[in-house]
Amino acid sequence: MRIDALALRNFRNYDALNVTFAPDCNVIVGENAQGKTNLLEAIVYLSSARSPRARAEKELISFGRSECSIKANAFARNRDFLLEIALAAGRRRKILINKVPVKKGSDLSDVLGAVYFCPEDLLLIRDGAAARRKFMDDALCQLRARYAQALSDYHRAYEHKTRILRDSEEYPSLLDTLPEFDLRMAQSGAVIIYYRARFCERLKEYAGIAHRECSGGREELGVEYQTVSTISDPLAPIETIYDQLCAHQASHAAAERASRMCLSGPHKDDIAVTIGGVNARQFSSQGQTRTAALAFKLAEREIYREITSRTPLLLLDDVLSELDPRRQEYVLNRILGGQVFITCCEEDRLGTLLSGKVFHIADGKVV
């Protein structure tokens, strides 16, 4: 898969941009705050209708403007696609694939897949559990439409239940509606756990391989999925996981009402990471945790390849400058194959790249 051409209008700091890309490597050079990351964000958004940075879609619209658009000519599954997204303040976004309106971001993921790697991802191992849940969610929402729907359903039910518990002291009758939201959370939560567990099994294998190669085989990377305590086997069928989630809800019902907090469900999931058998988050060095984070992102790309038999777009947002020369060389050797986008401040850092195009960005323009 690849993006051949991209057009932006009123997107972030781009008033208007029209650019054509190479099918292999695209190096985007520029000083900080010129629009390099914004360009990669637009590509990621085209692959999933999810921004890796913005909390709200209105943040994507240029300051002082009321609407923006992203368009791309793409090639995937042996055919051409025209992808279009239009955002307007106060209105629902519009997504079109070959001029046909679609409602879900997962429809875009059926065309394009993207693995986005930014400097913040190097903290993936040391950050809190929310960062590792986001890592799983970002990967799985592109791979499994059912997962994306379950995650959306779960978040809605979780928010409703949280409000009910919070307001129940003042309005006790609200508690009568809790069983409905418990049911919804158990149904969607079982799907989430089912797919996360399988993702982590593949992550263990592929990240382990990448970590051994990058570390010279000196250390072993351990990966273990952690979820609700009553789930005896996260790899069990969804029906079994659902029953065990219901049991966990029942055993925590009184505590939830007393604390007015939602205590049961996969919203507290985590990935336990060890390096050489030692808790990586607590005891590993910065270099060790960066190597592990690098292995996670490279593994994400391999998992996508395995499941879809296609190579996703790879976007490296100023990551190489954060790595030592040995890790830089390892990454550059591993990204061969498929379309790649790399941002950097200095072009000479990428002298080992043999083919592709170089773009110089300044103030939201290609110069």
Predicted features and spans:
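Conserved NTPase motor "head" modules and their coupling/switch loops across ABC/AAA+ ATPases, GTPases
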Residues: M1-E31, P172-L313, E322-R326, Y330-N333, ...
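Conserved lysine of the Walker
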Residues: K36
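Post-Walker A helix-loop "phosphate-sensing" segment adjacent to the P-loop in P-loop NTPases
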Residues: Y45-E57, A299-I307
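Nucleotide-state sensing region of NTPase/ATPase domains
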Residues: S48-I125, A129-A131, D137-Y147, K204-I209, ...
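Structural recognition of the conserved hydrophobic beta-strand(s) that form the central parallel beta-sheet
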Residues: A72, Q339-C345
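Long, charged N-terminal accessory/stalk domains
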Residues: L123-L124, A130-P179, L183
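Walker B catalytic acidic pair
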Residues: D317-V319
